């Protein structure tokens, strides 16, 4: 695979070229650009944003290539950039991005619609055996033979005016998206994997939409393993924290850290004095919120049992057999993926392997969703080998200790009951 790309697409000493672009900093020019770009077949775009000081990431710059026209849009210079988001949502074009999670969220938050025909080159690269998740610079180097400048990686994109060097640096983020997309699409067609990519993108976008419309209190770090009642406390305190952060346009964890939420839930008390005694709660900015936090705990304590959230059980991961089997299957999964020109990181994680084992060992709830490795294209590509591994018909062997992939799968005779 690497030889395929090096031979056809790699020019080792190539550098990025000087870029001509339009700088759009008022709403009239934005509308004119969007009207002209409405007939484009491809819209490749990227954003620059800052997320550490606000409740939601602050959009600072939009870079877009509409067929052969490249523009940099300054959302901080105008009140309304929704014409651009509506342009993305219009049918009839393909939207090309790299690692476009925040780009998708910006569009969804702005107009409540998806961009049309989403193509994420980071995900697509994993389907042809390149690493996942691969940085944009890595894909440019491997597939286009260019090297991106690195001088502006720590730019504060909120500050104005931006220099010509900063703007040109930003424009490079979309300059090669269409070219990389075409290379990946051709290889996907050769491998007959376009449908897999479409399924994965649809699943990925649906999960993002779901997360945007679902309370994310289960993502509080350290809350796994808490009882239903304590999870109810986590949920109530999280709701207060989220509302407070939104009203102050502040990162939620700057209002109250995750570990403090979990410790409050563990103590399971609505006593202000006991809450204040939690190490970390003595900070001045938290003192005025102690009564409110105590009220959150009290609400959770008064909930009927059936209204408390159920713990998300994925099996007892502390079982030594599950831990060892999870490690083994994760290693085996890597062998299967590399043999089929798939990025192991795209197919599944160590946790996905543990979930699969827990399911096969009957350690999950009967109403639990099927493990990720037993769904869709993943089940088709790795299912047969996974089943053979589970039944002792395949094993791992060291085939070449010096190779990039020293392990291989070895078929075994099917064991008999007396063997």
Identify what each model region corresponds to.
Residues 9-43, 47:
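N-terminal accessory regions of nucleic-acid-interacting proteins
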Residues 30, 52-54:
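Short N-terminal binding/cap micro-motifs at the start of the first secondary-structure element
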Residues 164, 174, 180, 184-419:
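Accessory DNA-binding and partner-docking regions appended to nucleic-acid-acting proteins
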């Amino acid at each position: 695979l690497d030889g395929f790309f090096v031979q056809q697409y790699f020019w080792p000493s190539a550098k990025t070229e000087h870029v001509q672009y339009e700088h759009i900093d008022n709403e009239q020019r934005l509308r004119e650009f969007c009207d002209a770009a409405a007939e484009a077949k491809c819209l490749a775009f990227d954003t620059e944003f800052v997320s550490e000081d606000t409740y939601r990431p602050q959009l600072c710059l939009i870079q877009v290539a509409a067929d052969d026209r490249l523009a940099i849009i300054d959302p901080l210079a105008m009140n309304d950039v929704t014409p651009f988001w509506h342009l993305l949502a219009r049918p009839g074009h393909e939207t090309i991005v790299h690692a476009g999670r925040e780009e998708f969220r910006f569009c969804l938050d702005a107009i409540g619609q998806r961009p049309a025909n989403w193509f994420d080159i980071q995900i697509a690269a994993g389907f042809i055996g390149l690493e996942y998740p691969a940085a944009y610079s890595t894909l440019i180097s491997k597939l286009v033979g260019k090297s991106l400048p690195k001088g502006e990686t720590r730019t504060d994109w909120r500050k104005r005016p931006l220099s010509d060097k900063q703007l040109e640096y930003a424009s490079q983020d979309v300059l090669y998206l269409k070219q990389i997309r075409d290379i990946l699409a051709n290889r996907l067609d050769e491998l007959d994997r376009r449908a897999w990519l479409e399924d994965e993108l649809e699943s990925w976008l649906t999960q993002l939409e779901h997360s945007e419309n679902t309370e994310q209190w289960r993502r509080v770090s350290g809350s796994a393993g808490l009882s239903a009642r304590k999870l109810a406390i986590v949920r109530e305190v999280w709701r207060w924290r989220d509302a407070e952060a939104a009203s102050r346009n502040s990162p939620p964890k700057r209002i109250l850290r995750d570990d403090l939420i979990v410790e409050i839930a563990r103590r399971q008390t609505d006593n202000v004095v006991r809450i204040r005694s939690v190490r970390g709660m003595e900070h001045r900015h938290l003192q005025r919120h102690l009564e409110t936090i105590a009220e959150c705990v009290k609400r959770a304590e008064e909930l009927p049992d059936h209204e408390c959230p159920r713990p998300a059980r994925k099996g007892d991961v502390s079982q030594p057999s599950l831990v060892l089997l999870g490690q083994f299957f994760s290693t085996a999964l890597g062998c299967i993926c590399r043999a089929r020109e798939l990025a192991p990181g795209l197919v599944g994680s160590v946790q996905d392997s543990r979930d699969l084992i827990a399911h096969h060992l009957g350690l999950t709830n009967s109403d639990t969703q099927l493990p990720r490795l037993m769904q869709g294209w993943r089940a088709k590509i790795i299912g047969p080998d996974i089943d053979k591994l589970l039944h002792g018909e395949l094993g791992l062997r060291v085939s070449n200790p010096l190779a990039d992939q020293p392990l291989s799968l070895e078929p075994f005779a099917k064991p008999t009951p007396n063997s």
